[in-house]
Swiss-Prot record:
Pfam families: Acetate_kinase. This is Probable butyrate kinase. NCBIfam families: butyr_kinase, PRK03011.1-5. One of its GO terms (molecular function) is acetate kinase activity. Keywords: ATP-binding, Cytoplasm, Kinase, Nucleotide-binding, Transferase. It catalyses: butanoate + ATP = butanoyl phosphate + ADP. GO terms for biological process: acetate metabolic process. Belongs to the acetokinase family. InterPro entries: Aliphatic_acid_kin_short-chain (IPR000890), Aliphatic_acid_kinase_CS (IPR023865), ATPase_NBD (IPR043129), Butyrate_kin (IPR011245). It is an enzyme of class 2 (transferase). It comes from Clostridium botulinum (strain Alaska E43 / Type E3). It is found in: Cytoplasm. Gene3D superfamilies: 3.30.420.40.
Length: 355
């Protein structure tokens, strides 16, 4: 069956939209918003009508007939923790997206705009594998400090999309496999996927795991406490050291991994040291996730922007191929992943989950 889908992925200073016929992209647009436009609104939710109008206007400009749409799909926002899958957008979800129960984020607008347009057209609206996807085993939640449980914050949409893609490509099905998925972008998340559930994963935003282009990953916690109480830093300055100015930015003042590798290959010893540590930490975290799966790993999947690297990918492969064979799905296609999530429901392959 043929479905036309409008996909909405709001970012902090832009809104990315795509129109798909099944998995074929008809067109894609990145609608950029100036600081002046964004500053007019006190909260993220206040931007709702402005962003919705911008989307409808571009569709009108392209002479696209929105009455031909089968469903609207939004990027999932900072909801309460949920298991992965495609969710029908309902009133309970809208209320939580409005207030941002786990924090303010532009992606909170994805479901809100999707439902608003969908309701006007009398068609369903969905979100797919939001960033708060949480399928951790109970044992993976304990950190050692009762007040500080481990949290599942990772690249759920892309990790799930490539895991399902490998399930299809291999003919074995995602639900029948044990996979380790490594997303390498601005942050690095390494997930243990056990028969369709991400039973353990590092908190790639501000928790633990390998350092990345912009994030610190796991740090020595005693020294971090001393830093916090040294009187030299505000809370936000310490947080920025962990998220934004950590990793490559902290050591080399750049988040450009390709540029660092180029310098290393031209003989820069400092770049070589940081690159080798980055590779080492990802390797070590893959080993942890192999242990979380009791050594029963069918395949390791590498994805995200850094998975295009002709240097890092072979280096990482040679470090971990003793655990399981490695398949590479470079980059990430969030719009396609959102479309695929809706198609699985419209085709009856999956049932829409209720929030």
């Amino acid at each position: 069956m043929s479905y036309k889908l409008l996909i909405i992925n709001p970012g902090s200073t832009s809104t990315k939209i795509g129109v798909y016929e099944n998995e074929k992209e008809l067109f894609e647009e990145t609608l950029r918003h100036t600081n002046e436009e964004i500053k007019r609104y006190e909260t993220i939710y206040d931007q709702f009508q402005f962003r919705k109008d911008v989307i409808l206007n571009i569709l009108k400009e392209k002479n696209f007939d929105i009455t031909t749409l089968s469903a609207i799909v939004g990027r999932g926002g900072m909801l309460k923790p949920v298991e992965g899958g495609t969710y029908a957008v309902n009133d309970a979800m809208i209320e939580d997206l409005k207030v941002g129960v786990q924090g303010p984020h532009a992606s909170n607008l994805g479901g809100i705009i999707a439902k608003s347009i969908g309701d006007e057209l009398n068609i369903p609206s969905f979100i797919v594998d939001p960033v708060v996807t949480d399928e951790l085993d109970d044992v993976a939640r304990l950190s050692g400090v009762p007040e500080l449980p481990r949290k599942s914050k990772f690249h759920a949409l892309n990790q799930k999309a490539v895991a399902k893609r490998y399930g299809k490509d291999s003919g074995k099905g995602y639900e029948n496999l044990n996979l380790i998925v490594v997303h390498m972008g601005g942050g690095v998340s390494v997930g243990a996927h056990k028969h369709g559930k991400v039973v353990d994963v590092n908190n790639a935003l501000d928790g633990d795991g390998p350092f990345s282009p912009e994030r610190a990953g796991t740090v020595p916690v005693g020294d971090l406490i001393k830093m916090c109480f040294s009187g030299q830093y505000t809370e936000s300055e310490v947080y920025t050291k962990i998220v934004g100015k950590g990793g490559f930015v902290g050591y080399l003042n750049t988040n450009d991994v390709k540029g660092v590798i180029d310098k290393m290959e031209a003989g820069d010893k400092e770049c070589e040291k940081i690159y080798k540590a980055f590779l080492y930490q990802i390797t070590k975290t893959i080993g942890e996730m192999a242990a979380a799966l009791n050594g029963k790993v069918d395949q390791i999947l590498l994805t995200g922007g850094i998975a295009y690297s002709p240097t890092l990918v072979p280096d990482l492969k040679s470090n971990v191929e003793w655990i399981a064979p490695v398949t590479v799905y470079p980059g990430e296609d969030e719009l396609l992943a959102l479309a695929q999530g809706a198609i699985r429901v419209l085709d009856g392959e999956e049932k829409a989950k209720i929030y």
